[in-house]
């Protein structure tokens, strides 16, 4: 079986028969006409067409393609810079899981800082409600930002789930801070118990 001699285009580096998919078709055709006229005739017609007209059109095509390529490169650079800024913002942000006392024996978990990571809060709330079989809702904190409220002492379980969720999004390095406000409150109440000053 004879080997097939593949002609590669000097403009786009594709096999010559695939130049139309390169985005540089006019320049590719001009190159093919100059370097392989027999293939040009076979694929695109008679070589005896007005060469000067072809070259002129090719020149105009070159300018248009160059402008288009530059515009695309500029757009890609802007997009890349935007993505880098967004990634830096995400990596420098943190998720806060706060354990708060509701009554003496009951507490709730408030999760904030998720909006930066494009996490669907409603979906997450439903996931927590079904996963932990508990009440779950969305409210706004003192900073007017949304947070997920989970009823029950589930700080460890919530933390583990948030870590796995961030890891799925490629955000493994993001800090997850757990604050036990219930303990702090209890400690503060203990230190200010009436009569405690007289015992010193």
UniProtKB/Swiss-Prot annotation:
Biological-process GO terms, alphabetical: formation of translation preinitiation complex; translation reinitiation
Domain of life: Eukaryota
Chain ranges of the SUI1 domain: 95-166
Assigned protein family: Belongs to the DENR family.
Protein name: Translation machinery-associated protein 22
Subcellular location as annotated: Cytoplasm
Cellular compartments per GO CC: cytoplasm; ribonucleoprotein complex; ribosome
Molecular function, one GO term: mRNA binding
Cystine crosslinks: none
This protein's domain notes: The SUI1 domain may be involved in RNA binding.
Matching PANTHER family: DENSITY-REGULATED PROTEIN, DENSITY-REGULATED PROTEIN HOMOLOG
């Amino acid at each position: 079986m004879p080997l097939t001699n593949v002609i590669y285009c000097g403009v786009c580096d594709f096999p010559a028969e695939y130049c139309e998919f390169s985005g540089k078709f006019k320049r590719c055709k001009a190159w093919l006409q100059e370097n392989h006229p027999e293939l040009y005739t076979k694929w695109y017609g008679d070589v005896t067409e007005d060469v000067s007209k072809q070259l002129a059109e090719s020149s105009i095509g070159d300018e248009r393609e160059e402008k288009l390529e530059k515009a695309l490169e500029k757009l890609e650079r802007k997009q890349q810079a935007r993505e880098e800024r967004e990634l830096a913002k995400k990596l420098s942000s943190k998720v806060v899981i706060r354990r708060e006392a509701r009554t003496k024996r009951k507490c709730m978990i408030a999760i904030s800082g998720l909006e930066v990571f494009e996490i669907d809060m409603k979906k997450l709330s439903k996931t927590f409600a079904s996963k932990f079989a508990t009440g779950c809702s969305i409210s706004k904190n003192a900073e007017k930002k949304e947070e997920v409220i989970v009823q029950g002492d589930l700080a460890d379980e919530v933390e583990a789930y948030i870590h796995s969720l961030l890891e799925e999004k490629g955000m493994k390095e993001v800090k997850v801070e757990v604050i036990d406000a219930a303990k702090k409150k209890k400690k503060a109440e203990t230190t200010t118990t009436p009569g405690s000053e007289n015992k010193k």
